[in-house]
Amino acid sequence: MMRSHYCGQLNESLEGQEITLCGWVHRRRDHGGVIFLDIRDREGMAQVVFDPDRADSFAAADRVRSEYVVKVVGKVRARPAGAVNANMASGAIEVLGYELEVLNESETPPFPLNEYSDVGEETRLRYRFIDLRRPEMAEKLRLRSRITTSIRRYLDDSGFLDVETPILTRATPEGARDYLVPSRTHPGSFFALPQSPQLFKQLLMVAGFDRYYQIAKCFRDEDLRADRQPEFTQIDIETSFLNEEDIIGLTEKMVRQLFKEVLDLEFGDFPHMTFEEAMRRYGSDKPDLRNPLELVDVADQLTGVEFKVFSGPANDPKGRVAALRVPGAASMARSQIDDYTKFVSIYGAKGLAYIKVNERAKGPEGLQSPIVKFIPEDNLNVILDRVGAVDGDIVFFGADKFKIVSEALGALRIKIGNDLKLHTCEWAPMWVVDFPMFEENDDGSFTALHHPFTAPKCTPEELEANPATALSRAYDMVLNGTELGGGSIRIHRKEMQQAVFRLLGIAEDEQQEKFGFLLDALKYGAPPHGGLAFGLDRLVMLMAGAQSIREVIAFPKTQSAADVMTQAPGVVDAKALRELHIRLREQPKAE
C-alpha cells in the first residue's frame, strides 16, 4: 500500500510514529523559511511541516502548488503550544516531513476550493470532480454512504432480500413521462426506463419472496424542482402478509434507528394524522409540524354576509373559507401584505383579506381591516375567538374552492413560518394516512391519488358505487414538510384491480395490453402485500441540511435535465440512428 494512514486518522496516540500519507495539497504556506502543507484526502486534513535542514524534501515542498497529488513520509509530533487548531480533527498534532514525492501535478483549478461561495452552480457542475474535493461536499457523500449502509443492515437483519429488478422495461402509466429507449432488434418498439420498480416488486410477492428491498434507480421525464432529478434513487420495500400498521411500524423503526446511528438523534413515536385533517389544519398532505400556525375553518360564520367574496365560497359545498392567525404580527407593513397577496396568487387565490387586531376590547374600532365592515360584530367575535386572536395578531383569510384555499393558505403558512422564524423544533416526523383513492377531475373522471395498484378500504362493489368518497390503504411518512416516503397495501385480487382500472377509464383491451401480466399474476394465488418507497436523495438532503438534492448526488443533472460536465444529452450519429430505425424530422441545432 502507498499509505499507512488516512489524514483523518492521525491523533496524539500516533505521536513519535513514522507514517505515510497520500493526498492533495489543500493549502501551502511559507512561514519564515518553514513550509507548511495541508494535505487532504477522503478522511480529512493533516498539517505537514518541512524544515530547510532536509534540503531535498524542502525543495520539493517549495515547488508544489494547490491540488498537486503527493506522497509524504514523516513523523507525527505534537504541535507547539499555541499552535493547536481546534477546527481540525488532527489539530493537536502535525507531521514533520522527511520525504515528499509528487505523484501528479495540477493546473490551477477553475475555482478555489477554499472560496467557493461565489462560484456559480453550473461552473461547479461542469467541474464536479473538482467540486467534490471540497471537504463539505465529500462529507455529504460520506453521509449518504452511512445512511444506505444503516438501511441495508436494518433490512437485512429484518429478513428482507436485496433483489434487482429490470431497468429496461415497458411503458406503464404512472403519472409522469417515461424515458424511452428504442429497440434495435424490435424496429418501432421502445423500452421504458422504470419510474419505480412497483409492478416487479409486486410480482416478487406473488412469487413468494415475502420480503424484498432494493436501492433502486428510477427515472421520470418531468419538470425539475429543487427536490427533483430525472434520475433518482429509491429505497424500495415490499412485504407480504403484513397490514398497514405492521409496515408503518417496521419502517418507522428503521428511520428511528437510522437517525440514532448516523446523527445521534432520538425520535419518539411518530404522530398519525388523516389526509382530511392535514388538509384542513395545514393546507397540505405533507404538513411541517415544526410550524405552529394552523388554518381554521370559518365559513359557517360568513354564509349570510353581503360580501360575496366570502358568502359565495361559504355557501358552496366545494368551497372553503379559512383563517390563518399569525401571532404578534399586527405591525406587518402593507408592502409585506402585498407581497404575500402576490405570493398566494401563484396558487390561484384571487386575493388575501386580513384583519389586524390592535385592541379587541374596543370591538370593530380596535380592528384594522377593509373587510370588518362586511361582517356582523357577533360573527366577527366568534371568528376571532375561534382562531385565538389577541391584541397584536394579524389574521389572514382565504375564500375560494377548497383546493385553492387549502393550497394557498398552506403555502402562506410555510412562507410566514420561515420568514418569521416560527419553528418550535428542529425535526418533526409524522405519518399521513387515510388518503382518498381518487382525485375527481373537472370533467367528472378520476385519477389515482397514489397509483392504480393501491388497495381501497372497501369492496369492489362499494368502490364502484361511491368512488369519490372511497379511502385508500395508503400512508406517507413526512419529515419537516417533506414527503420522505409513500406506500400502501396493494390490490391482490384481480376483480378489485379491474374495478380500479374501470374507474380510471382504462378499457378492458387496454388493461390486457398494458397490465395483462399483472392481471395474470393475480389469478395465481397472489398474497396480501404492501410496501413503501423512500426517496433516498431527499432523505440525505434533509439529514445533511442541504438546500437541494443536487448537493447530495455525486453527478446530478441541472434544472434543465442536462449534464454540463459530459455534455449529455448529446447528438447521436446517423449510423446509430439508422440501426435503431429512427429518422429525425428536424436536425438538432448546434449549441
From Swiss-Prot:
Which UniProt keywords are given for this protein, alphabetically ordered?
Aminoacyl-tRNA synthetase, ATP-binding, Cytoplasm, Ligase, Nucleotide-binding, Protein biosynthesis
Q: Where is this site: Important for tRNA non-discrimination?
A: H31, G82
Q: Which GO terms describe its molecular function?
A: aspartate-tRNA ligase activity; aspartate-tRNA(Asn) ligase activity; ATP binding; nucleic acid binding
Kindly list the positions annotated as binding L-aspartate.
E174, R220, H450, R490
| The EC number(s) this enzyme carries | 6.1.1.23
Q: What PANTHER family does the entry give? A: ASPARTATE--TRNA LIGASE, MITOCHONDRIAL (PTHR22594:SF5), ASPARTYL/LYSYL-TRNA SYNTHETASE (PTHR22594)
Instruction: Give the protein's biological function.
Output: Aspartyl-tRNA synthetase with relaxed tRNA specificity since it is able to aspartylate not only its cognate tRNA(Asp) but also tRNA(Asn). Reaction proceeds in two steps: L-aspartate is first activated by ATP to form Asp-AMP and then transferred to the acceptor end of tRNA(Asp/Asn).
Instruction: Family membership, please give it.
Output: Belongs to the class-II aminoacyl-tRNA synthetase family. Type 1 subfamily.
Q: Quaternary form?
A: Homodimer.
For this entry, the protein name equals Aspartate--tRNA(Asp/Asn) ligase
**Species assigned in the record:** Pseudomonas savastanoi pv. phaseolicola (strain 1448A / Race 6)
Source gene? aspS
